[in-house]
UniProtKB/Swiss-Prot annotation:
Transmembrane residue ranges: 235-255, 328-348, 378-398, 414-434
Residue runs in coiled coils: none
Catalysed conversion reaction: K(+)(in) + H(+)(out) = K(+)(out) + H(+)(in)
Protein name: Potassium/proton antiporter CemA
A Pfam short name: CemA
Native organism: Zygnema circumcarinatum (Green alga)
Top-level taxon in the UniProt lineage: Eukaryota
Membrane topology: Multi-pass membrane protein
Keywords tagged on the record: Antiport, Chloroplast, Hydrogen ion transport, Ion transport, Membrane, Plastid, Plastid inner membrane, Potassium, Potassium transport, Transmembrane, Transmembrane helix, Transport
Signal peptide: none
Family designation: Belongs to the CemA family.
Protein's cellular compartments: Plastid, Chloroplast inner membrane
Predominant location category: plastid
Length: 453
């Protein structure tokens, strides 16, 4: 068996897969080294071109090109370093295992000739290095890559402060936040002022056409719209899925075992609240009545009271188990809801700039529609929330929410909510139409009232 393993190791060592496997760290480091050379060349050429007069005219286009090259080079450098470290770690562990195995065979007393001819000490030590690559060369390349990364950060700072900010601030009144934790560090959003943006944009475009700068602002406008849409979609996806995923993972891994152990061992009660106990009593009465009805219909005279009591006892134990699990589920629902709300609040608090971008993007989509479509969507939303048939929907929502937190259906609570909450929504909507929409676009208000009538 040992000779068979040695033969397999000899064949693996002489195969092309083995050479490819041992050369993986060197290939990864070489890719990162080539990408760092590209960054250093861009840094040298950027300093040379910046002093030319043509840079003032084509500076923004040059910055766009530099950004694309830097993004690609940065990805290659970081991915190559990650692959280098991971493969180096795996190869080190693997070579240590092979060296221990070879050393154990060398110290055997029988003197295995097959092993002595194929695996000597010098060949075993070769497994601890990276395919004839010295540490001095590796350290020199790593130092070069580190210097290239420093140049890359300097290039990003220089290219981000040249032409896009003054153009957009002067022509479109756009703010560019520079510290967003996203795929792009420069995500733009437009501020909303008292004057409608359609008027300011029309005036800005007129000035741009007169000054002959229409070509130079097409790319900034496209880049602004692209970053705005990308950041808004990412933020909306995070707001929807991240709290749900985080609370579900916490529920499965941590909360469910802890709550089940606590409720089954530390608590003597079965019911979470009084409504569960009342529902269990009503269910038990129904089961007992159905059992007596079956006995009367079947006309079984030999049915003893002890058998009836035993069946009722078994049904009671089943109900206890059902409501015990329901109590655990209710506690889990409350905890997961609290975790989801906390996660959502953290996202809204830490992502204020993203929220401003998302708000601006939604307003851009809304104001880009025609007046008829705007009035249609407003009518659709109001009819769903405060329309004639909306109380039935609110009753279903409140009933499901009460069942979710472990309470029974209470018609007084539902009636109180349905009679007050839609009225508050109607008041807020009318205030928004009167105060904001009437000032921004009076034609929408006229179309809305016409369609509503």
């Amino acid at each position: 068996m040992c000779c068979y393993l040695n033969l397999l190791m000899i064949q693996f060592e002489s195969s092309h897969i083995c050479h490819w496997f041992w050369n993986t760290p060197y290939r990864a480091l070489q890719r990162a080294y080539k990408a760092s050379k590209k960054v250093r060349n861009i840094h040298t050429n950027y300093i040379f071109c910046k002093s030319k007069p043509a840079f003032q005219r084509f500076g923004y286009n040059l910055d766009l090109y530099i950004d694309s090259i830097l993004d690609e080079s940065s990805f290659q450098i970081y991915w190559g370093l990650l692959e280098f470290k991971a493969s180096r770690f795996v190869l080190t562990k693997f070579s240590n295992l092979i060296f221990k195995h070879n050393f154990h065979l060398l110290t055997q007393t029988d003197g295995n000739k097959l092993f002595s001819n194929s695996f000597d000490r010098e060949q075993s030590l070769l497994f601890c290095d990276i395919h004839s690559t010295s540490l001095k060369i590796i350290n020199r390349k790593l130092a070069w890559i580190e210097a290239a990364l420093a140049d890359l950060e300097m290039l990003r700072d220089n290219s981000s402060s040249t032409s896009i900010t003054p153009i957009l601030n002067k022509v479109y009144n756009v703010s560019l936040p520079m510290s967003l934790d996203s795929t792009s560090k420069r995500v733009a959003y437009e501020s909303v002022g008292l004057v409608p943006r359609s008027i300011t944009r029309t005036f800005a475009r007129f000035q741009t056409e007169l000054a002959g700068r229409s070509v130079s602002v097409v790319l900034p406008e496209f880049r602004l719209a692209k970053y705005q849409a990308t950041a808004s979609v990412q933020y909306m996806a995070c707001l929807i899925f991240l709290p749900w995923v985080f609370s579900t993972i916490c529920k499965i891994i941590f909360l469910q075992p802890l709550v089940s152990h606590y409720w089954d061992t530390m608590q003597t009660q079965v019911f979470f609240n009084a409504s569960q106990e009342q529902r269990a009593l009503r269910r038990l009465q129904q089961i007992e009545e159905l059992l007596w009805l079956d006995i009367v219909i079947a006309s079984v005279p030999n049915k003893h009271l002890q058998d009836i009591a035993g069946e009722i006892h078994n049904k009671t134990l089943e109900l206890v188990d059902i409501y015990n699990r329901e109590s655990i589920c209710t506690i889990l629902n409350l905890l997961t809801d609290w975790i989801s709300i906390t996660c959502l609040a953290c996202l809204l608090t830490w992502g204020k700039k993203r929220l401003a971008i998302f708000n601006s993007w939604i307003q851009e989509l809304f104001y880009s529609l025609s007046d008829t479509m705007k009035a249609f969507f407003i009518l659709l939303l109001t009819d769903l929330c405060i329309g004639f048939h909306s109380p039935h929907g609110w009753e279903i929502i409140i009933t499901l929410f009460l069942e979710h937190i472990g309470f029974a259906h209470n018609k007084y609570v539902v009636s109180c909510f349905v009679s007050t909450f839609p009225v508050i929504l109607d008041t807020v909507l009318k205030y928004w139409i009167f105060r904001h929409l009437n000032r921004i676009s009076p034609s929408i208000v006229v179309t809305y009232h016409t369609m509503n009538e």
